């Protein structure tokens, strides 16, 4: 029974680590998308 609990805890730690990495990557992509949009808008509307 204790061995099963250890495996569950390991799996849970792995899952929570994956979730935190996914959240971090989503935040980075959001920032990059915002920056790219801003730069495109400045490039398009900069001549006016």
UniProtKB/Swiss-Prot annotation:
Gene Ontology BP terms: negative regulation of cell population proliferation; shoot system development
InterPro entries named among the record's database cross-references: DVL, DVL_RTFL_regulatory
Keyword Transmembrane helix: yes
Topological relation to the membrane, as annotated: Single-pass membrane protein
Coiled coil: none
Transmembrane parts of this sequence: 25-42
Keywords associated with the record: Cell membrane, Developmental protein, Membrane, Transmembrane, Transmembrane helix
Locations listed in the record: Cell membrane
Region described as Required for DVL/RTFL small polypeptide activity: 13-44
Gene Ontology CC annotation, any one: plasma membrane
Family designation: Belongs to the DVL/RTFL small polypeptides family.
Annotated function: Small polypeptide acting as a regulatory molecule which coordinates cellular responses required for differentiation, growth and development, probably by restricting polar cell proliferation in lateral organs and coordinating socket cell recruitment and differentiation at trichome sites.
PANTHER family per UniProt: DVL19-RELATED-RELATED
Protein name stated in the entry: Small polypeptide DEVIL 19
Organism: Arabidopsis thaliana
